[in-house]
């Protein structure tokens, strides 16, 4: 079989025009078209009067033709496998060249990027002391701030109120007797706040003036 595959010529298309590869042993046809051709010949032989006389020998001829078709199929597959192996072996030989090209490009990129990293190192280290100075100054400014003690006495009578005290809008804490604005002379202007709230909730809607032509 190996000698037969080596002696086969290059791939050729089927003579019937089906698009598959043909074989000179099958009259330039592919395996499928060759089987159809054999079946047509057998059918035409059966229809002839000569074929009726030799009806007993037809099964043997059919089996022989099928064996021949199988042998041609095996030959075609072997030829196709040899051509595919040759086509696969071609890019394998070209792999070392591509690897060398990639290694050369990687080495050039490393040489180009190496001086950039050396220049960027002092630039990063220089602003480090300037960044630390404002952080220390901010910590010094925040240090003197102390939490304000909670008010727990009435602003008027200085009575301990605790959690039962009343906060006024003027910002002071009062007991139950002095919580009203008229009891502790509250300086907060409630009228101005109410007027501003009314203006905000009820805006004045004015129609646009008609422009004369």
Swiss-Prot record:
Keywords tagged on the record: Acetylation, Cytoplasm, Metal-binding, Phosphoprotein, Ubl conjugation pathway, Zinc, Zinc-finger
UniProt: Zn(2+) 3 binding residues: 168, 170, 184, 186
Single GO biological process annotation from the record: smooth muscle tissue development
UniProt binding sites for Zn(2+) 2: 154, 157, 175, 178
Record's signal peptide: none
GO cellular component: cytoplasm
Modified residues (N6-acetyllysine): 209
Zn finger residue spans: AN1-type: 148-194
Subunit structure of this chain's protein: Homooligomer and/or heterooligomer. Interacts (via A20-type domain) with IKBKG and RIPK1 and with TRAF6 (via AN1-type domain). Interacts with ubiquitin and polyubiquitinated proteins. Identified in a heterotrimeric complex with ubiquitin and SQSTM1, where ZFAND5 and SQSTM1 both interact with the same ubiquitin molecule.
PANTHER family: AN1-TYPE ZINC FINGER PROTEIN, AN1-TYPE ZINC FINGER PROTEIN 5
Designated name of the protein: AN1-type zinc finger protein 5
Biological classification of the source: Eukaryota, Metazoa, Chordata, Craniata, Vertebrata
